[in-house]
Amino acid sequence: MAKTLPFSRALLLSLSILLVARAISAGDIAIYWGQNGGEGTLASTCDTGRYAYVIVSFVTTFGNFRAPVVNLAGHCDPAAGTCTGLSDEIRSCQGKDIKVLMSIGGGAGDYSLVSEADADNFADYLWNNFLGGQSSSRPLGDAVLDGIDFDIELGTTTFYDTLARALSSRSTQAAKVYLTAAPQCPHPDSHLDAALNTGLFDNVWIQFYNNPLAQCQYSSGNTNDILSSWNTWTSSTTAGKIFLGLPAAPEAAGSGYIPPDVLTGQILPQIKTSAKYGGVMLYSKFYDTTYSTTIKDQV
């Protein structure tokens, strides 16, 4: 006859299993910041306590050996040197154990890489102006950001793998360079496939929005497409963690918005079973008035 555990020990064991299960499935929230002056400061974004990653966006012009251009919309003007005060805010965020990344690309801009030498040259610029290198004209001041985010939606599709390798090669045990990417949900992504295949990316936050014809996002109560696309991405992508990228409000994207109750009740319980699940990415801070607060405990 099998022995039974005393009630107190059985209860303790059950609680331990529950806590471990919750720890395994717990995810983070990443947010894009920088494209609307009405979204509040970088420091106030981090002060909310809702985000583990804040992605400063964007470097909108680069490649072909041109001088890169940083666009932070209504916040400040990097070209005029009025963004250097962000360094204190970046350090404040990092002091709260929040990773701050610089995003390159975006949905509007003028960028392409034309050769391996061009990619290496741009990697040097990113290293010297945002990461651990040195430059007399760092757009955001002397703070050292945690890494680079690839949000490549325009231009040529080549040499981003070279860029990823060049940036990754600068990582050390003392100072890691985090690499993240935001591919579109149609698989494989036309711009980032080669880069993602390097296996060098720590987080990949897939944009499950603005692709209404691709059958890879949520629409009108249908969760099948987004869940199928999630499974395709997680089974074929080598990355530290994979995030579900969503608009933070209906106005934040042309399509793909998921009501919070649908996300927490029908989608998150399914995708959190994946070992690669990392959490949710939201676009953007300006639109995130209530969404992250509503879903945070379930992410």
UniProtKB/Swiss-Prot annotation:
Task: Kindly give the CDD domains that the UniProt entry links to this protein.
Answer: GH18_hevamine_XipI_class_III
Mind telling me which GO cellular component terms the entry cites?
amyloplast; extracellular region
Which cysteine pairs make disulfide bonds? 46-93, 76-83, 185-216
Quote the tissue specificity entry: Highly expressed in seeds and to a lesser extent in the skin of the pomegranate fruit (at protein level). Not expressed in leaves or flesh of the fruit (at protein level).
| InterPro entries in the cross-refs | Cts1-like, Glyco_hydro18_cat, Glyco_hydro_18_chit_AS, Glycoside_hydrolase_SF, Glycosyl_Hydrlase18_Chitinase
Q: Show the active-site residues.
A: 153 (proton donor)
Q: Which residues form the GH18 domain?
A: 27-299
Q: How does activity depend on temperature?
A: Optimum temperature is approximately 45 degrees Celsius. Removal of Ca(2+) from the protein by EDTA treatment decreases the optimum temperature to 35 degrees Celsius.
> What span is annotated as transit peptide?
1-26
**Which SUPFAM superfamilies does the entry mention?**
(Trans)glycosidases (SSF51445)
Extract the signal peptide range: none
- Has UniProt tagged this entry with the keyword Transit peptide? yes
Described by its record, this protein's role is as follows: Hydrolyzes chitin. Probable calcium storage protein of the seeds. Binds calcium ions with high capacity and low affinity. Involved in seed germination.
Q: How does it assemble?
A: Monomer.
Name used for this protein in its record: Acidic endochitinase Pun g 14, amyloplastic
